[in-house]
């Protein structure tokens, strides 16, 4: 069985490049700061589709720059470990890190989903209680109606029926307070997107560890660009969806919220499979 880098260089890029694009798409679907911040920002400023695309591309640009720095740094450092006796150990260590990352992502997603389900159940209970109370007091009907209507002014996509983790809710609420109804310039939109994309991600670590094993700059660069392309597709789509009201999609298709909630599970499984693949090759190389 050939080495991991040799398999890629001899024509297996057709599998790993689409996988990198898929990884980027799934990373963009994960509950995280960049996606939620952009959606909340576009909704708060009542942004256009053009502004949403601009914001998504800016976030992708900065996110890609971070991945490039990490990947190039890893490829530079890997030159010190060219001996065949050392490479299998690097693959095995990389596999352990990747599998740990995948397990952490899976656990974080499960915990966030449980918190959302508990909070949504509590919200439904309170809503039903208020309805019974208003029914018994005709005099307070107008006051209660106005109060309830005001209390349900939320950013689209941040309602009780849409899944978000704790960090997403906090950032969306903060952005809604700061930018609600304000007029912003294109420069401010670009700056917001660039800073929002600087947050590190577990998927970038996976791309880094794969590139370390490639020992081929062209294919390694292609992998990073493929990941960035997938991320750009998701971030731009999210921004445009916020601009044209993603709630309409949720109303027309009941499975929309479920898909957004379950996407991180697929992402963590994909990362885990990459870790298993690298681990098998590392273990095989050590035993030879």
UniProtKB/Swiss-Prot annotation:
One of its GO terms (cellular component) is plasma membrane. Residues 1-12, 73-85, 210-223, 287-288 are periplasmic. The keyword Ion transport applies. The chain crosses the membrane at residues 13-33, 52-72, 86-106, 189-209, 224-244, 266-286. It holds the Pfam family NicO. GO terms for molecular function: monoatomic cation efflux transmembrane transporter activity; nickel cation transmembrane transporter activity. Induction: By nickel and cobalt. Transcriptionally repressed by RcnR. It is found in: Cell inner membrane. Keywords: Cell inner membrane, Cell membrane, Cobalt, Cobalt transport, Ion transport, Membrane, Nickel, Nickel transport, Transmembrane, Transmembrane helix, Transport. Residues 34-51, 107-188, 245-265 are cytoplasmic. Residues 123-155 have a biased composition (Basic and acidic residues). This is Nickel/cobalt efflux system RcnA. It comes from Salmonella paratyphi B (strain ATCC BAA-1250 / SPB7).
């Amino acid at each position: 069985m050939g080495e991991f880098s040799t398999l890629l260089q001899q024509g297996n890029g057709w599998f790993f490049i689409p996988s990198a694009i898929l990884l980027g798409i799934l990373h963009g679907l994960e509950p995280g700061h960049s996606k939620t911040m952009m959606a909340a920002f576009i909704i708060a400023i009542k942004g256009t589709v053009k502004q949403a695309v601009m914001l998504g591309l800016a976030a992708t640009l900065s996110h890609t720059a971070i991945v490039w720095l990490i990947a190039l740094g890893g490829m530079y450092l890997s030159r010190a470990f060219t001996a065949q006796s050392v490479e299998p150990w690097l693959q095995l260590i990389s596999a352990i890190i990747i599998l740990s990352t995948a397990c952490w992502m899976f656990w974080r997603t499960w915990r966030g989903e449980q918190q959302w389900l508990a909070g949504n159940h509590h919200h439904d209970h309170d809503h039903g209680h208020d309805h019974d109370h208003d029914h018994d007091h005709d005099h307070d009907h107008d006051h209660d109606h106005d109060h309830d209507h005001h209390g349900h002014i939320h950013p689209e996509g941040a309602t009780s029926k849409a899944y978000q983790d704790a960090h997403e809710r906090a950032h969306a609420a903060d952005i809604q307070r700061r930018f609600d109804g304000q007029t912003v310039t294109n420069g401010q939109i670009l700056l917001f997107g660039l800073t929002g994309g600087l947050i590190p991600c577990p998927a970038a670590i996976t791309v880094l560890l794969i590139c370390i094993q490639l020992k081929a700059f062209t294919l390694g660069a292609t992998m990073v660009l493929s990941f960035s392309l997938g991320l750009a597709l998701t971030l731009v789509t999210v921004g445009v969806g916020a601009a044209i009201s993603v709630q309409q999609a949720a109303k027309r298709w009941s499975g929309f919220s479920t898909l957004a909630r379950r996407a991180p599970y697929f992402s963590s499984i994909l990362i885990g499979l990459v870790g298993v693949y690298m681990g098998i090759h590392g273990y095989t190389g050590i035993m030879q």
